[in-house]
Amino acid sequence: MRTTLVPTAVVASLLAPTAAHADTGEDAIPRLTDSRGRALTLRGWNVEDKAHRGEQALSAITEKHFRDMRAKGFDFARLLVFWDDLEPRQGQYSQAYLRKIGRVLGWAEKYDVKVLIDAHQDVFGPAFGHRGIPEWATRTDGLPFTPHPDDWFAEYFEPAVQRAFTHLYEDADLRRAQARMWRVLADRFRDHPAVLGYDLINEPMGELREGEDLPTAARRIEREQLTPMYNRLADAVRSADRDGWVFVEPTPIVGEGVPTGLGRIDDPKVVYAPHFYNSGMEAGADYDPAAGWIESYEQAVTRYPKEYKVPVVVGEWGPLNNSLPNMNRFYREAMASLGRYSSGWAGYVWCYGGGYCAVDGAGTFRTNKELTAEPYAEAVAGTVRSTSYDPATGVYRLVYDSAGRHRSRLTELSLPPGAWQVAARGRAIVLRRTEGRAWVLAAPGARVTVTATRR
């Protein structure tokens, strides 16, 4: 660690108060903030173990995951946890599973990675050969289910799966059980320094009614079932944790550029957490720049946070076949789009191998995924005016108005591997640098420009 020592007189001059101002438009999407009021940017990956259960649960996640993510400049992990592992029998919560979650959170804390605890489900849960809601909480009314091994997402449209979602949303005892599950998690991890918040359910779906097309059904499910569910679960979390952020997802249909039907969630710390997937690319197609998918997605997905004034964090994104001819352009355009409206994202998925994995067995980025590693400001002590990064020149620029005298004025930068020169102008100094990170101290109310240049 290389530390730059700053003379006391210089620091004192930076702490002298000056006038501050902010420029916020009516359509501005709020930024996610930390406990000190700093504007956060989250860049990271999903971390998961879907293969192991019981005594082996979470065993595929190791300390190496967090060490390697932080070494490449990422500060965020969306940790998948499963209700079927937490409560394998109704009313009996696995203390061993909670300890395993705690061990993973300990590694995140060690490497200064913020964690979102995600109550994950795929195709509802184990009753249908996947993970998520326990079998004891799965009610199908005897409706049929046919597996689709070559297209697992199609299983969401099987009658038994759709009916199971309806019961989860509507049955009073299942509502209470889901709320209790969240109280257990929030009570256990509310004081853990690595925990940023709670993603209440992954990619929720529901039951289509006769004559409905998919967008119409999705908006109805979001409006009539997901909105009240999220309000119930937010209340459950708040009964144990008053400070963590509550992340709420629309149905995955937003990936088709369909605005959500979600209503207001009555909680002061809500984050809108859509996923960013295109059905054609998920089926193996290349990115088609002429189709305008990114533009239509961005237009649709920003309506909710603008209306309800909540921050956005994209919980999953990234194509399966990332080495196709147009994927380099996709990653560049996707990164630019995400930077325009979100407070961050978690790519899918940090693992060592093929498929969706971010890196190969040697820990090297797989084709085009290196484009996700950019300089960014993890925490800005003030109001962000603009950020930009030009990969061609290797220049990152942040302009912000620093906070007032009674608030934090320490801004933190994350830098990808390599040699970087960091400079600050406007009554600000680069207080300290280490490999991959830098800290900037600014006078209160100053207009500050920070530049990081790849050498």
Language-model-detected regions and their locations in the chain:
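Active-site mouth of glycoside hydrolases
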Residues: 27-42, 46-245, 250-258
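Aromatic- and acid-rich polysaccharide-binding/catalytic face
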Residues: 196, 202, 250, 261-290
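Acidic (Asp/Glu)-rich catalytic clusters
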Residues: 66-73, 187-193, 261-271, 302-307, ...
